[in-house]
Amino acid sequence: MANTVSAKKMTRKIAKRTAINRSRRSRMRTFIRKVEEAIASGDAATALTALRSAEPEIMRASQKGIVHKNTASRKVSRLTARVNALQA
């Protein structure tokens, strides 16, 4: 348990930041899931629109420190490859 005033304040800040990060990570995963569901259904047009909305969300998560930049790029790259394969 935090004893000093500054430690109590840091505990509050950490709790707030954790909630924000959890929300951002969940939002990113939701966008990824929408793309994957569209790919699974075989609908290329829906998959493409879902990918176009998911890409900025994934990159925003990387800029906010939710995921590493390379991880975000890898996710976008793999989703793009799957959508392109669906269109071909």
From Swiss-Prot:
<dbReference type="InterPro" id="IPR036510">
    <property type="entry name" value="Ribosomal_bS20_sf"/>
</dbReference>
<keyword id="KW-0689">Ribosomal protein</keyword>
<dbReference type="GO" id="GO:0003735">
    <property type="term" value="F:structural constituent of ribosome"/>
</dbReference>
<keyword id="KW-0694">RNA-binding</keyword>
<keyword id="KW-0699">rRNA-binding</keyword>
<dbReference type="GO" id="GO:0070181">
    <property type="term" value="F:small ribosomal subunit rRNA binding"/>
</dbReference>
<comment type="similarity">
    <text>Belongs to the bacterial ribosomal protein bS20 family.</text>
</comment>
<keyword id="KW-0687">Ribonucleoprotein</keyword>
<comment type="function">
    <text>Binds directly to 16S ribosomal RNA.</text>
</comment>
<dbReference type="GO" id="GO:0006412">
    <property type="term" value="P:translation"/>
</dbReference>
<dbReference type="GO" id="GO:0015935">
    <property type="term" value="C:small ribosomal subunit"/>
</dbReference>
<dbReference type="Pfam" id="PF01649">
    <property type="entry name" value="Ribosomal_S20p"/>
</dbReference>
<dbReference type="GO" id="GO:0005829">
    <property type="term" value="C:cytosol"/>
</dbReference>
<dbReference type="InterPro" id="IPR002583">
    <property type="entry name" value="Ribosomal_bS20"/>
</dbReference>
<protein>
    <recommendedName>
        <fullName>Small ribosomal subunit protein bS20</fullName>
    </recommendedName>
</protein>
